[in-house]
């Protein structure tokens, strides 16, 4: 279906015809743990990866399969792997690329959970990370070590929406035989397709814009099919016989989808962060309206920014669409259709003023999620990024007077009026 536009693909990929078992137009929920094999030889072929298809519910499910195929198509990748959460997608990706004694180069200004994983949890397993100013390409290059296994970035940094130069970073990664891994949760494939700019692996917390309604946890890894694992020589568990799967070479068994297949067959098999069929079904419902919601999110965000930049109680607004943002040129390059409905601003004063503003809101919900159709607010320094030290907070561009907004799809007049409620409480 590659000849169709995004808005059509988000509705039809993976189920171009009604369900063959029932003629249902909607994707059914296949609530089963396991699948009947036609014969012993058929079972052996499935387990040997010689025959594609369902093996066991922890690894695959037909509802899950439609979701994976659809998001992979929207991103321009060759395969998808859906998991129980965005955190699971990030963790499985890093663990598939780096083993004990190895190293990652990562953007400083990323989601607090990802930063904590890389800075504190993975070092316990022997995987260390150097955090870099992603805009300083010399610093990025200098951070690469002989044991480095990936460069990790976000299309829109969390929470300040800083933007990396994906093309330039892909060139650096590939020159060193490394894949470029990018979290596109805030970008979404509707606004930007990182694989077209050189990224090799794309990650989403599907909990956010893909699901879109604050009902469902999920994550997905998209294999771009662009990285030559055999040529690199740095990932023998993918390109050489793998003893954990009776000597299979995933580059031979799965071709361009070797990375996604390795995670499914080994890491998902062994660690079990599987997605349920019902969750996959809910995420498909969100996917069907992704473009419509993103257009409204962007429209409302533009008007909120116009309001905030002129408000006397606002010290600074951090959004790359603004000309004074250091990444404005990159925003125009990579986001020609707009975007970035999650951003921060600094209120005049400190933590107390920020708290009063937040507590004075009525429509905005104070919670840790983002990218919901409902408008959301939080104080990052004491919540989502509270595990970071003061130095790490400063590196991430988060202050005690920083407030994060996630602009929803309510009527813009009501959103602006509620922001007035917050400022009135200060």
Name every feature range the model reports, one short phrase each.
Residues 2-61, 69-70:
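N-terminal "arm"/small-domain region of PLP-dependent enzymes with the aminotransferase-like
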Residues 39-91, 113-121:
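Conserved N-terminal alpha-helix of the aminotransferase class I/II PLP-enzyme fold
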Residues 78, 119, 128, 146, ...:
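PLP-dependent enzyme catalytic core of the Aspartate aminotransferase-like
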Residues 156, 185-187, 322, 348, ...:
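Active-site beta-loop-alpha junctions enriched in small/polar residues
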Residues 222, 344-346, 406-408:
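Short hydrophobic/aromatic beta-strand micro-patches
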Residues 271-274, 278-280, 285, 289, ...:
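Conserved small-domain helix->loop->beta segment predominantly found in fold-type I
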